[in-house]
C-alpha cells in the first residue's frame, strides 16, 4: 500500500519518522510554526526541543525503546579491556588530576 504524498510532495513514512507537513501530523506542525521555524527544524522525539535549523521539512525522530547507555562499537577497543563503567560511584580514578585547593573569597580581597 503506497503512502499518500505530504504537502511538500514528499512521502510520509510514519513507521520511522513523522513528517510534520503531513495532514495527519498537522497539530505538531502548527506547534513548530509557533516556534518560528516553519518547515526548517529537527524536533527531538525524546525532549521535544528543536535541535537544529535546516532547509528540509520538519521531522520528529522516533523515541528509542531502550534508554540504557550502550557504548558505540569500537569504544571498548579504544579503552582497552576496561569497561566504560569500571569504577563504582564515588571512587576517583588514579589517573585523574587532583582538584585545586578551595580559595576563600576574603583571601582574594573581595567583599561579599
Swiss-Prot record:
Question: Where do the segments described as Interaction with host HPX lie?
Answer: 28-66
Region Homodimerization, and interaction with host AMBP/bikunin: list its residue ranges: 70-112
Q: Specify the domain of life of the species encoding this protein.
A: Viruses
Residue span of region Hydrophobic: 7-23, 40-60
- Please tell me whether the keyword S-adenosyl-L-methionine is annotated for this protein: no
Q: How is it modified after translation?
A: Palmitoylated in the N-terminus.
Note whether Lipoprotein occurs among the keywords. Answer: yes
Cellular-component GO terms for this entry: host cell endoplasmic reticulum membrane; host cell plasma membrane; host cytoskeleton; membrane; virion component
Remarks, miscellaneous: The viral particles present in feces and bile are non-enveloped, while those in circulating blood and culture supernatants are covered with a cellular membrane (quasi-enveloped).
Protein name in the entry? Protein ORF3
Q: Which species is this record about?
A: Hepatitis E virus genotype 4 (isolate Human/China/T1) (HEV-4)
